[in-house]
Amino acid sequence: MESKLSLLLSLLCFITCFHTSFSASGETNPFKSVPDLEKSMYKDIEGFPCVRLLNLTGEIGCSNPGREKVVAPIVRFKSSKELTESAAILVSVDEFESVLSRVSKDSDFASKVAGIFVESRSQVQNGLDGFSPDVKFPQAEFAPYTSNNFQWNPAQGSGIMWKAYNFPVFLLSETSTSIVQQAARASENSKMSYTKVVSEFDLVMQTTKSGTHDSDSCLKEGTCLPLGGYSVWSALPPISLSSSPKPKPIVLAITSMDSASFFRDKSLGAESPISGLIAMLAVVDALSNVDGLTELNKQLVFLVLTGEAWGYLGSRRFFEEFDQQSDAIKGLNLTAIEMVMEIGSVGMSFSQGTKTFFAHTAGDTTSVNETLSALYSAQDSMSENVMVRKASTSNPGVPPSSLMTFLTKKPEISGVVLEDFDSTFSNKFYHSHLDGLSNINSSSIVAAASLVARTLYIQAGGSDPLALNSININASLVEELLGCLLDCEPGLSCELVQRYISPSTTCPNHYVGVILGEPSTARYPIYAGDISRFVWNFLADKTALPSTNASSSCPKHCNGDNELCIRQEAVEKGVCVISSTR
């Protein structure tokens, strides 16, 4: 299912590599060719760019001031308090926000900033109180309540990712940080000489033609592309598409798979939201092993959304699919959705030895109380120290979440968002490049997944205590997913991902992509990103029933109702299964 809305748009025309030029200083070197000379003068530096985005009201992010490349000497921030000439400033992460704050307030200083390099170093999170470039109430304009001055992200939310900067900004890799630090020192030491070490931003990071400053105009002119991607839903057990009795009420479990960051290619989002995604995949895996799900009086449906970090694109598109009666939601009945349970940030739940989660609720009191009762029953059935608490009544409503879209589009719906925080984010690095693997704990995710899996079973009508107690989360699967989705080693080259798809890259990144062309009606999202294709295959596999065409050529002879071809990228021929996965 494709998320395509014209809320926030971007032409990702940027470069992730730039040159640092070193002038000769009296040394004579024999050069046999022009490439030899160039190699002695330039060092290629790896960086992760801040890119330009446009919305209906204007521009945010970074771009060059014009269409010429930028060349400027490199200086450290501490020595650049009063810039006498245009310079590229090298800053540490803890200095970064103050530099951008000065740029916003001091026009003379801003006019001399040619670019900014941000250092990387290992374990930098340990020395920071926090770093979040998002605002104090992320996406407040989509809240279904009026208290949008509430601060869910109070201490760290600087809002710098929502401003426009007319100079390039790059996050350096750790290796490149050392090189640029040396260059900055060389610039300092050469103040009295004619030699300079300069940075050269080798390509113009310009997103739109002159005069195009919002998403509406650039879309009409074809000079930008809409943000978006493929969301995935699946039902357990599969929903029959043939004539059948009245459809069962639906218990809908949702989570999201995309994050955001100041730097596009450094958006892991480990705590927010990938901990929830991993918990969801583990939940589906656990419930797929439970017998008797077809006899339950409610239908379990799982929805993994993309584009949620940018205006809830995925969940808004989900409702648009219903308005259009699209094939993407064939088998689903919007009016049948009785309860929504969202898995939010669940990777940091430890409190005095107990894993504590908070249930943020909205909607009909009776339905909410039934869900809370199911959560408490699930909690009591677990042997480990896990606690569920109802979120504070002083909160204005649910925290930033996909449930906000559901409450706006279908106000009568009831829902619960499970989080590891009550009134303020636990995540000090929300929507930051620092929200990585070290920011979360696998046992917290396992506990959340156990809680949700058992709660969903109870909500769907399961009452067998033996079946309930048999629902256990595969902790090894959670660990494997952490390595696959939040690290470069093994990253997407891990055995689990390779079992389903042939990824285009090894290092995962969860920043939403762009949409090329019209949404596809194909059953398999072949042009979707690596994460969406993996999630689609995983859910289709775990929720599947065997097909009578299992031994047939796939996908050629896999075209019956609810028949899907999974693993077609990973093996010579895929496997045909019956699954309600789109």
Where in this protein do the model-derived segments appear?
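Secretory-pathway/membrane protein signature
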Residues: M1-R582
